[in-house]
Design a protein with these regions (language model features):
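A short helix->beta-strand "capping" segment at the edge of beta-propeller domains
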Residues: 1-11, 67-72, 132-138
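Beta-strand-rich domains and repeat architectures in extracellular enzymes and scaffolds
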Residues: 4-52
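Blade-loop segments of beta-propeller domains
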Residues: 8, 43-95, 101-103, 141
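Beta-propeller and closely related beta-sheet repeat lectin domains
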Residues: 15-19, 78-87, 146-152
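Residue-level detector of Asp-centered blade-edge/turn motifs that repeat once per structural unit
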Residues: 21-24, 89-92, 154-157
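Glycine-centered tight turns/hairpins at beta-strand boundaries that repeat
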Residues: 22-41, 96-106, 159-175
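Beta-propeller blade signature
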Residues: 42-63, 108-129, 174-176
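Aromatic- and glycine-enriched pocket-lining scaffold segments that form the walls
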Residues: 115, 127-176
């Protein structure tokens, strides 16, 4: 095993994001732009550090493209900028579950309670052409999806969602 650092034009880095691959490109969604969240409850997971773009990276050419998520419905755009979503790719579809972050609609930090299906082929094409991305996301809302920091896997035709937790309100690394 060997690892080599690579610089991607226009990409500053992310933390705790979801990733998929399509057409030899990486698709990055969610996470934080400010590195590890701060440990003080009043400052942890500030909305200012949310990743508010869907980013496409071509690792061969070292190019990147992005599209903002502000025009998506709030329930989708808020979840897409959360941290530690569970994610799994099946074919041309990326599934995103839960994630933790600030919700303007709730007026507080929440663990999101939905599953979002992302159509990768259309999304990548739209982002590279500077088009609209709205039609490439579908969402199902159910409290069963309110998880962050879990893992999802697939054995045969069955998906398994394991572990994780649900935080409501400001995250406190020192306990309740």
């Amino acid at each position: 095993l060997s690892i080599e650092a690579a610089e991607i034009n226009g990409f500053a880095g992310l933390h705790s994001f979801a990733v998929a691959q399509y057409d030899r490109k990486w698709i990055l969604i969610g996470g934080r732009t400010d590195g590890l969240h701060r440990r003080q409850p009043f400052a942890a997971f500030s909305p200012d550090g949310n990743n508010t773009n869907v980013i496409v990276i071509d690792p061969q050419t070292k190019q990147s493209w992005s599209a903002g998520i502000a025009d998506l419905p709030p329930a989708i755009s808020e979840q897409l900028q959360s941290t530690n979503m569970q994610f799994i790719q099946t074919g041309k579809t990326l599934y995103l579950i839960g994630g933790y972050g600030y919700s303007k609609a709730a007026g507080n930090h929440i663990t999101h309670r939905s599953l979002i299906a992302v159509k990768l082929d259309g999304l990548v094409a739209a982002i590279q052409k500077g088009g609209t991305i709205n039609s490439h996301f579908r969402q199902i809302i159910d409290p069963i999806f309110a998880l962050t920091g879990a893992q999802i896997g697939k054995i045969g035709d069955v998906y398994y969602l394991v572990g994780g937790q649900e935080f409501q309100g400001r995250y406190n690394p020192m306990g309740p």
